Amino acid sequence: MKTLLLTLVVVTIVCLDLGYTRKCLNTPLPLIYKTCPIGQDKCIKMTIKKLPSKYDVIRGCTDICPKSSADVVVVCCDTNKCNK
């Protein structure tokens, strides 16, 4: 009986943990990812036009997806490491 209870507790903890964790890439190059904080359940990639041929890329976690503009292209997604 104790083994069954322990198993149920472990399964519950694992399931609860998976319920709110999102992993998003968070560097300009798509190599390193981080676990998003609670409440930020979307990944974001923002490409910012600096000069005619120069762009900055920002990746990370977000709770809302801002709109794109003429100089900023925003892509949001809701699966792990989807902001490549």
Swiss-Prot record:
User: What disulfide bonds does the UniProt entry report for this chain?
Assistant: C24-C43, C36-C61, C65-C76, C77-C82
Its annotated compartments are:
Secreted
Its family remark reads: Belongs to the three-finger toxin family. Short-chain subfamily. Aminergic toxin sub-subfamily.
For this UniProt record, the keywords arranged alphabetically read as follows: Cardiotoxin, Disulfide bond, G-protein coupled receptor impairing toxin, Secreted, Signal, Toxin
Protein name, UniProt field: Beta-cardiotoxin CTX23
- Function text: Acts as a beta-blocker by binding to beta-1 and beta-2 adrenergic receptors (ADRB1 and ADRB2). It dose-dependently decreases the heart rate (bradycardia), whereas conventional cardiotoxins increases it. At 100 mg/kg, intraperitoneal injection into mice provokes labored breathing, impaired locomotion, lack of response to external stimuli, and death (after 30 minutes).
Q: What else is known?
A: Negative results: does not affect blood coagulation and does not show significant hemolytic activity.
Organism of derivation: Ophiophagus hannah
Please give the tissue specificity annotation from the record for this chain. Expressed by the venom gland.
